[in-house]
Structure formats: structure tokens, C-alpha cells
């Protein structure tokens, strides 16, 4: 079992139950899924760049990414409907906990002059979005083999009803929020 899942069951769940006074164990919020999205604005003309980004995202998450395509044509961006514009991965279960563990304990501390993540990036329904500027913070990515730096969005989807519950859940799981 993933380390973070063990921690959730042994420490986080009881602490949440005590703080928010849930009557049932099923009321305790948990992370439902983590969506990792990589937008590749300029790679629409470069199929090799798309391939490299998809491969890197696969290495980072341990799961094959889905190539996202443009829904509509936008003339200003020289974009046609159906063109590949990014890649995303939805992680659930064991892989989700393993990825979260690697992100919180290995990758985020490697960010240059890191002071914590934005504590206000909740969406009002208990989900948290986190933006990363470059994929090099993950140890699985080799610096020499990277053609181009890509940022990514990481969205933690939780079963929490409010942002307060979600913030507490992520804080107890080790999310380094900025003061």
C-alpha cells in the first residue's frame, strides 16, 4: 500500500473526524483523483515536440497520457479543430497516492526558491489546482534529454464539500502551503 494512503488511514482521517465532527467515516473527505494536464501551445506545428511531451508526462505519472485536441478552430491562434494541443493524465487509486507522495516529498522541494504553494488556489468546491513551471523538478526526467521546458497543471479533486475541509485534508497529507 502507498505510504500516503497509510498515512491517510492512520493519521489524517482520525484528525479530520475530530476537527470537523463527522458522524460517519464515509463523510471524511479524501482525494478522489489527480489530473495532470500539460498544455503544448507551440507544439501544434511540431509533432516531435508533442511526442516528447507525451513521453515525459508518461514517465512522470507512470500512466499513458491522453492527447487533448482543440474543440473549435481559433483563427487568432492559427488553430484548427482536432489539432493536438496538449496531454493529460487522470490518476486514481494506488498510482494517485504514489504520484502525490513523489510530488509533495521530492518534486516540490526541488523547485527553485520554493516558499510553499498558493493557499488560495481552491475552486470553491473543495478542489485544489497547482501550476508547475517546468517538468525538471521530477527526478524521473533527465535534464540532458529535455528538448523544451513545459509547465503543467496538477488538479487535486477531493470529496470535500468546502475549501476549508479540502485545505485541512491537503495540509495534513503534507501539502506545503505558503504562510
UniProtKB/Swiss-Prot annotation:
> What is the name attached to this protein's record?
Large ribosomal subunit protein uL5
Quaternary context = Part of the 50S ribosomal subunit; part of the 5S rRNA/L5/L18/L25 subcomplex. Contacts the 5S rRNA and the P site tRNA. Forms a bridge to the 30S subunit in the 70S ribosome.
The answer to whether keyword Chloroplast applies is no
Question: Could you say which protein family the record assigns here?
Answer: Belongs to the universal ribosomal protein uL5 family.
Output the GO biological process annotations, alphabetical, semicolon-separated: translation
Protein keywords: Ribonucleoprotein, Ribosomal protein, RNA-binding, rRNA-binding, tRNA-binding
Q: Which InterPro entries match?
A: Ribosomal_uL5 (IPR002132), Ribosomal_uL5_bac-type (IPR020930), Ribosomal_uL5_C (IPR031309), Ribosomal_uL5_CS (IPR020929), Ribosomal_uL5_dom_sf (IPR022803), Ribosomal_uL5_N (IPR031310)
Function of the protein: This is one of the proteins that bind and probably mediate the attachment of the 5S RNA into the large ribosomal subunit, where it forms part of the central protuberance. In the 70S ribosome it contacts protein S13 of the 30S subunit (bridge B1b), connecting the 2 subunits; this bridge is implicated in subunit movement. Contacts the P site tRNA; the 5S rRNA and some of its associated proteins might help stabilize positioning of ribosome-bound tRNAs.
Entry-linked SUPFAM superfamilies: RL5-like
Q: Name one Pfam family in it.
A: Ribosomal_L5_C
Q: Which gene encodes it?
A: rplE
Among PROSITE patterns, the record links this protein to:
RIBOSOMAL_L5
One GO CC annotation, please?
Answer: ribosome
What GO molecular function terms would the record report? rRNA binding; structural constituent of ribosome; tRNA binding
Amino acid at each position: 500500500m502507498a505510504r500516503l494512503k497509510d498515512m491517510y488511514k492512520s493519521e489524517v482521517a482520525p484528525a479530520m473526524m475530530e476537527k470537523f465532527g463527522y458522524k460517519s467515516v464515509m463523510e471524511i473527505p479524501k482525494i478522489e483523483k489527480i489530473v495532470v494536464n500539460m498544455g503544448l501551445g507551440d507544439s501544434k506545428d511540431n509533432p516531435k515536440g508533442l511526442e516528447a511531451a507525451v513521453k515525459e508526462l508518461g514517465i512522470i505519472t507512470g500512466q499513458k497520457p491522453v492527447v487533448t485536441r482543440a474543440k473549435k478552430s481559433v483563427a487568432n491562434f492559427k488553430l484548427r479543430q482536432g489539432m493536438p494541443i496538449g496531454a493529460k493524465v487522470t490518476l486514481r487509486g494506488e498510482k494517485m497516492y504514489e504520484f502525490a507522495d513523489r510530488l509533495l516529498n521530492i518534486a516540490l522541494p526541488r523547485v527553485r526558491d520554493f516558499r510553499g504553494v498558493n493557499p488560495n488556489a481552491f475552486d470553491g468546491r473543495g478542489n485544489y489546482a497547482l501550476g508547475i513551471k517546468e517538468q525538471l523538478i521530477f527526478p524521473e526526467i533527465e535534464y540532458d534529454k529535455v528538448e523544451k521546458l513545459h509547465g503543467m497543471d496538477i488538479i487535486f479533486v477531493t470529496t470535500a464539500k468546502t475549501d476549508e475541509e479540502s485545505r485541512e485534508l491537503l495540509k495534513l497529507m503534507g501539502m506545503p502551503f505558503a504562510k
